[in-house]
Amino acid sequence: MKILPAALAVGMLSLAACSSQTKDTTTSATGDPVGLKAVVINDALPYSTKNGDAWTGLDVDVLKAIQKEQSEENATTELSYVEVGSVSEAKDALTSGTANIVCGVGFSWKRSRQINYTLPFAVGGMRLLTTEGVDGTPESMKGKQIGVITGSIPANLVESQLPEADAKGFDSPDAALKALKDGEIATIAGGALWSKANMAEVPGSRMVPVRPYGRAGVGCAVTHGNDALLASGNLAIGQLLQGYIDGDEESTRIINSSIGSDSPVGLEADKIAAYYNSVLGTVAGIGKDE
């Protein structure tokens, strides 16, 4: 099953048309494209991690795909990274204009008032990474301490879904994971893919419950007004998803090395492809004649 590039582009651009129609800030007054300034957090597998001076992870590969898409549409677009240490710093970077895009973020209706989301390239939700004999249900977590990343969607889900648990805040995913490794805390709440990617770092740990709380798509987000950047992001992500479905070598490498069979997450290829088909089916026709 294939989506013709033209049909895919129409679907992606129609998404941007549904976003806010405010001033487009992806080009300067001279018409030159504004560089991609991406928020990144270190040690946030499978999305982003820093090795020396180089960033790797699913977010980085997606950002490079968006950079390539923008460079094909305009002149060469530069990609730079704005490293932050907490969710609050990430929000500040976006609202201040220091950064104009962030990837690896779960969809939230509340946050959609401030930012526009691209197509998702993964699906997440909140799961608990724990060394205790709990099953992750509200009953089993009564009175239990749960580490959360302050300001994150999982932190909000702990508050709403596990109200009788005792939430302990950490500034970053790395700080929460370190506390779990050191035995400072027995359970932390994180994105489902993040929890799976880091489970091997904590001997004897497991993920609960079986089904995540607050299951939602994971993609990139830009501030309102960046309509052309949103369109480029949607087109690049759509092509990445379609490439994976069609067995494109580079698309398959990107996805499998981050969340597929070649990664600690280990999602099955047919399940990834089924999800990507469902995503693309909402924005462009997929059929034998296309």
Where are these regions (language model features)?
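Acidic, polar ligand-binding/catalytic clefts
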Residues: 75-140, 206-207, 211-213, 280-287
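Extended ligand-binding regions for polar small-molecule ligands
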Residues: 19, 57-70, 134, 140-145, ...
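Extracytoplasmic small-molecule ligand-binding "clamshell" domains
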Residues: 24-105, 113
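Bilobed "Venus flytrap"/periplasmic-binding protein-like clamshell domains
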Residues: 42-45, 53-72, 106-107, 123-181, ...
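Immediate post-signal peptide segment of exported/extracytoplasmic ligand-binding proteins
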Residues: 19-55, 135, 139-145, 275-290
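Bacterial N-terminal signal peptides that target proteins for export
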Residues: 1-7
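C-terminal motif of bacterial Sec signal peptides marking the signal peptidase cleavage site
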Residues: 14-17
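Periplasmic-binding protein-like
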Residues: 41-43, 122-132, 196-238, 259-286
